[in-house]
Design a protein with these regions (language model features):
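Hydrophobic N-terminal alpha-helices or hydrophobic patches in metabolic proteins across all domains
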Residues: 1-178
Length: 178
């Protein structure tokens, strides 16, 4: 995969491309794309017997404060295969801190033209409460058995905050390339 040729989205920060690394409900394996080669590597096998609560990936041509592309979860009724690109819109953000610093996770749903099931979801609060609880629980505990790794779950943010974080991550990536 030539990640450098995949745009941020067709209308960022409203509509973003998310490159999926881990499918919802998949085996407890953390995959990660090598941005230079485009190859999908096994980053690690989770030490906790937990499955990802949503399709997990990143937004290309963004840069988070931790030095990685902006992470995104895409809520959907189906798992997406690793390596696929999903057009999604951010509806919120979960602010985390881990051993590397701040680590925001965008919460997204597929754009209506891809899957209109979530067309009435404009904010994370529009999702069933249990979905948000599962996401928070997963990130609070998925590193529990890994030595020298930790996570602190912070506050949830709304769609406006998610869009602002995306704008800042796009700008940070542009500055890093300059």
């Amino acid at each position: 995969m030539r990640i450098e040729h995949i745009p941020v989205g067709d209308n960022p920060p409203e509509s973003l491309n998310v490159i999926i690394e881990v499918p919802t409900g998949g085996e407890p394996v953390k995959y990660e794309f090598d941005k230079a080669s485009g190859a999908l590597f096994v980053d690690r096998i989770l030490h906790t017997p937990m499955r990802y609560p949503a399709n997990y990936g990143f937004v290309p041509h963004t840069l988070s404060p931790d030095g990685d592309p902006l992470d995104a979860l895409v809520i959907a009724r189906s798992p997406f295969i690793p390596g696929c690109v999903v057009r999604a819109r951010p509806i919120g953000v979960l602010n985390l801190e881990d051993e590397h610093g701040g680590d925001e996770k965008l919460i997204c749903v597929p754009v209506d033209s891809t899957f209109p099931y979530y067309s009435d979801v404009g904010e994370r609060e529009d999702l069933p409460r249990i979905v948000l609880q599962q996401i928070e629980h997963f990130f609070k505990h998925y590193k529990d058995l890994e030595s020298e790794k930790w996570v602190r779950v912070g506050e949830w943010g709304d769609a406006a905050e998610a869009r602002q974080i995306t704008i800042e991550a796009i700008e940070r990536a542009k500055q890093a390339k300059a």
